[in-house]
Amino acid sequence: MRAVVQRVDGASVSVAGATDDPSAPGVVGEIVGEGLCVLVGVTHDDTPQKAAQLARKLWSVRVLEGEKSCSDVNAPLLVISQFTLYGDARKGRRPTWNAAAPGEVAEPLVDEVVAQLRALGARVETGRFGADMRVSLTNHGPFTVIIEV
């Protein structure tokens, strides 16, 4: 599993069709104040154990102001699935997605990351798996780190 973790002062994700107007994007997840926006990618050999390991790492990694973790200050996380984290653009002009797990494999593992975070006591908001999403955030720093488990 691969996660791109950004320290934010607020973030939201919206999806077209999430409101009564199918063409208007509606907010499906939002965090206010200091927290983490986490983009999660899944590859073929990922397991529920790796999802739990990633959740523990996200909850305890000290990347917030003052070298604090989300668990230290009860900061929220916005978790968004993103298969493109396993894209490969080394050859040609078009990336390949061969390393990304198919949706039927990836979705339950992203859900497991979220469930494990919540079991640890985290406040978690999410995007919508497989949807065309719009992510808005205020990056604090900017501070971005990649975590692989």
UniProtKB/Swiss-Prot annotation:
It catalyses: glycyl-tRNA(Ala) + H2O = tRNA(Ala) + glycine + H(+); a D-aminoacyl-tRNA + H2O = a tRNA + a D-alpha-amino acid + H(+). A motif (Gly-cisPro motif, important for rejection of L-amino acids) lies at residues 141-142. InterPro entries: Daa-tRNA_deacyls_DTD, DTD-like_sf. It comes from the Bacteria. Its main location: cytoplasm. It is an enzyme of class 3 (hydrolase). Keywords: Cytoplasm, Hydrolase, RNA-binding, tRNA-binding. The keyword Metal-binding does not apply. PANTHER family: D-AMINOACYL-TRNA DEACYLASE 1, D-TYROSYL-TRNA TYR DEACYLASE. Belongs to the DTD family. An aminoacyl-tRNA editing enzyme that deacylates mischarged D-aminoacyl-tRNAs. Also deacylates mischarged glycyl-tRNA(Ala), protecting cells against glycine mischarging by AlaRS. Acts via tRNA-based rather than protein-based catalysis; rejects L-amino acids rather than detecting D-amino acids in the active site. By recycling D-aminoacyl-tRNA to D-amino acids and free tRNA molecules, this enzyme counteracts the toxicity associated with the formation of D-aminoacyl-tRNA entities in vivo and helps enforce protein L-homochirality. This is D-aminoacyl-tRNA deacylase. It comes from Streptomyces griseus subsp. griseus (strain JCM 4626 / CBS 651.72 / NBRC 13350 / KCC S-0626 / ISP 5235).
